[in-house]
Amino acid sequence: MDNKLQLHGFNNLTKSLSFNIYDICYAKSEAGQRRYIEYIDEAYSAKRLTQILTDVNAIIGAEILNIARQDYEPQGASVTMLISEGHEAPAAITNSESPGPMPEAVVAHLNKSHITVHTYPESHPHAGISTFRADIDVSTCGRISPLKALNYLIHSFESDIVIMDYRVRGFTRDISGQKHYIDHDITSIQNYISDATADRYQMIDVNVYQEKIFHTKMILKDFNLDNYLFETDKDQLVPEERAHVQKQLQREMAEIFYGRNYKLRR
C-alpha cells in the first residue's frame, strides 16, 4: 500500500489490538498457591502496569491525556489510559509489516484512543495449578498500528501462552474523496513478531482478510518443568509426582491454548 497516501482531514481508521497473556504455575500446597498469587499480584501491580503502558505509548507515538488505575482486593489490577496521536511518531517506528522494538530499546517520552489492561490471577481448588492472565487492549485512531507494541508486550510479561486479535474498522478518505478501509499491508500478526521471539513459540493463525480480522495464538515450544514450579524444583519431587505434575501443567496449557477441556488420563 502507498505509504504516501494523501488524506482528506484526519485518519479516521480505528486499529484495535486485543492481547491476552497467560502465565502458568504449580505450587505443592494451598499456602504455596496463595504466596504465588500474592507474588504475581505484586509483580504486576497497577503501578507496574502503568509503566508498561507508558512505554507502549512511546512505541506507538501517542500522547497520554489521562490515566486511571486501581489495585483490587483480594487480587488483580486495572489501568486505563486515554491517549491521542502525538505530533510526531518515533523516528524508528513505521507502519510497515515488521516487528516493533524490544523493552530494552524503549525510552518513555510522553509527548481519541485508549489503552487498557486488566489482570486476573486465579488457582485451581485442588490440583495445585495457578494461572495469571493479563488482558491488554490497544485502540488507536491515526497512522500508527498498535501491532508495533507486540514485541514489547510479549517480553514485558512472563508469557507462556499469548492470544492476539487485531482488527481495523471504519474508513478514511483521500484528497479525491475515495474511501480507504485499511492504510497498511498486513498478511499476519506473526510478521510483527521478531524472529527470536517466533523461534520460541508454536503459532497458529486464523485470519479473515476481507473483514480485516487477524488472529494469532502462541504457546511456548520448549517445556522445562522447573520454569513452572513455585518455591520448589523438580529434583524435590519423586519421579511419579514429577510426571503427574508435568502432565497436569501441559494439559492446563493445552486447554487454554485450544479453548477446550480434556479428560486427564490416568
Curated annotation (Swiss-Prot):
SUPFAM superfamilies documented for this protein: S-adenosylmethionine decarboxylase
Mod. after translation: Is synthesized initially as an inactive proenzyme. Formation of the active enzyme involves a self-maturation process in which the active site pyruvoyl group is generated from an internal serine residue via an autocatalytic post-translational modification. Two non-identical subunits are generated from the proenzyme in this reaction, and the pyruvate is formed at the N-terminus of the alpha chain, which is derived from the carboxyl end of the proenzyme.
Residues annotated with Pyruvic acid (Ser) modification: 113
Catalytic residues in the record: 113, 118, 141
UniProt xrefs under InterPro entries: AdoMetDC_fam_prok (IPR003826), S-AdoMet_deCO2ase_bac (IPR009165), S-AdoMet_deCO2ase_core (IPR016067)
Pathway per the UniProt entry: Amine and polyamine biosynthesis; S-adenosylmethioninamine biosynthesis; S-adenosylmethioninamine from S-adenosyl-L-methionine: step 1/1
Site (Cleavage (non-hydrolytic)): 112-113
Keyword Acyltransferase attributed: no
Coiled coil start-end: none
Name of a matching Pfam family: AdoMet_dc
Any single GO BP term: spermidine biosynthetic process
EC number: 4.1.1.50
Tree of life domain: Bacteria
Cofactor binding mode and count: Binds 1 pyruvoyl group covalently per subunit.
MF-aspect GO terms: adenosylmethionine decarboxylase activity
Stated role: Catalyzes the decarboxylation of S-adenosylmethionine to S-adenosylmethioninamine (dcAdoMet), the propylamine donor required for the synthesis of the polyamines spermine and spermidine from the diamine putrescine.
Family listed: Belongs to the prokaryotic AdoMetDC family. Type 2 subfamily.
Protein name: S-adenosylmethionine decarboxylase proenzyme
Gene that encodes it: speD
